[in-house]
Every structure is written in C-alpha cells, then in structure tokens.
Amino acid sequence: MKKNIFIALLFIGGLTACSDNNEGSDIPDNPGYPVTHFSKIELKEVKEEPGAPAVTVTQTYDYSAGRLINFTSTQSFVAGGELFKIENATNVVYGDHQAVVTDEINNISTYTLDDNGYAISCVRQEMDGKIRSYTFDYLINTEGKYFLKNITETLDGNKSYSSINIDYSSYRTLRITQQVDKSEQTYIASTSTGNEIANTSEIPYLFLTDLYPLSFHSVAIYGKFLGDAYNTLITDLRPEDNSGSNETTTYTYRFDKKDVDISCSELTKSYGTDLSLIHISEPT
C-alpha cells in the first residue's frame, strides 16, 4: 500500500490487440505458453511533490508472438530548463522450460517453467552476490487458467524470509496475506456484489507488484509466467485490520468499444485523508 502522499497520472497505452481477422498476427497456433494479446503495455506515472520537479516514470512492456521480450523503465524530469532521462532496460530470453530475466545492473532471475509455460521456481542472483530463491503455487480453474496462489522467498539457500498467499475461496473477495520476516499483513480485495466487471483486457492487478516479494517479479507478472490475470477486476482493496485508519482503496474503470480496459482511477483514503489519486487513461 502507498503511504506517501502524492498525486499521479498513470497511462496504459499501446494496447494493440491482434487484428480482428488475425492477419499479420505473430502468435502461433497452440503456442504452449500463456499469451498476451497486445504488442505493448505502457504505464506512465507522473509524481508531483512540493519543491521538487515533476518526475515521470514510464514502464514499457514489449511483446512478440504473445510473449514478453523486453521491459524498459524510464524516469524523466526537467531541471534548469533541461530534460533529463534515466533509462533502465530488462530483457527476457526463453529456453527449454526456462525464462531468464536480466536487468540493467545484471541481476539475473532464472525461472523454471512447467509444460504450460508457468513458473514453478526461480533463482535470483544479484550483483552483490545475494541469492534469492522462490517457489510458486497456483489455483487452476476449469478453463485451464493458472492463478497465482502462493509465492515463498528463501534467502541464501536456507532461510525462509517472505511469502504471499492468495485465497480464492470467494471469487468476489480475495484474501491476500503478505508475510515478511516476522510481520504479517492481510489485504481484502473485492469486486462489486452482483455487478462484477470482467477483466477482458487481462491486465494484472496494479497493487500486486507493490507487495514484497512480488515487487521483484513485475516482469514475470506482466509476462504471465506467474499466472493469468484474474477473471474480474478489483473495485475495492483494504487491510483486513483497518479499524484505526479506515484505510480503503477504490478503483473505477473505463473501457473502449471493444471492452478493453483503457482507463482506471485509484483513490486511497486513510484517517479521512486522500493518500493518493491515480488516473489511468489512454495517451492522447
């Protein structure tokens, strides 16, 4: 959950699906791995704070043959009338039952994939020599979709340090429990009762990549080798124990004529104060 106060704009753009007649589509028949039907997903966040220049953070996910191949994160700001940009690139290389993610500073995450292209484990080798190991577990529905149910992180080969468990017992209300070292926090993510919104664009939940240890795996989440996006869109998120703060986050969505999710507004309130206001919309 975001604790700092800021106002941001977040854009999802480049959601270019295959043409209706599939002409020119590079997605093979029966690909044997989870497919994303967009050539690019772009998220743009503009952070504004008093006394500091606005910083634009752009995250771009590029796909080929329905698979994520590149991720680029760019920070840009204007100071003294000059535009500054800081860019970090991450690439994904696929092998036999394997996806290798290498970032700008040579942190290497090697995912072992099952026969359907979903990760069952990962070893992350960081530039300072630290090794993080992960295991993943899924709920598989009747349509054969994989929904991430558990991630467990082990440090230096033997110390279980963190985990996230997602309880799908109620499809309208997900219970997400995050454990880091000896602390634990549970979040309740829900959709409107009797008015579920179908996630036709199959965009991952934005808040998942903010939760440690999933924060190390945003590329895998957007690459779908950590499972498929859930069938419905979340409209409310809150800590299970929010009796003191009454903290809640609400999401509203806007769609194009093909029911592709092109706009979302996120509003977090705590102790009666707006903590963040985020709008997601298509670039103009």
Give the role of each language-model region.
Residues I5-G13:
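Sec-dependent N-terminal signal peptides
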Residues T16-A17:
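C-terminal motif of bacterial Sec signal peptides marking the signal peptidase cleavage site
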Residues N21-S281:
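Buried hydrophobic residues that stabilize the cores of well-folded domains
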